[in-house]
Amino acid sequence: MCGYEWRTEGKRKVPMSVHLKNREPFGLAGLSDVWRKPDGKRVESFTIITTEPNELVRPIHNRMPVILQPQDEEQWLDASRTPFAKAKSLLKPYPEELMEAHDVSPIVNSAKYDSPECIQQFRMRHTER
């Protein structure tokens, strides 16, 4: 799993892949809820919790999702047994030395593309800048 973020260069947005160096999937801290509208319709909602960016992400964006360390995922998911203070302590930037980022092709700007090319490192040709 990786995430995309767009770095601003002047008036241009450059898509980037941000991921763990080991390329392993990772868990994000989030919250979910199920509630009913006044008309009785069931609504399922969720949010991904963000935090201040680490040094890798800071030049790209002013926040980042909370990426959970593998050993912390079960504690986050078991709210009934994890004290609030412990859960809150997990809401911190992921160590930048375990992550990397690189430019990717502008094809990621279109939802119609779903290929490995979307995460491959990309170098913009001078004429494309």
Set out the residue ranges of the language-model regions.
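A structured binding-face within diverse protein domains that lines the active/interaction site
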Residues: 1-129
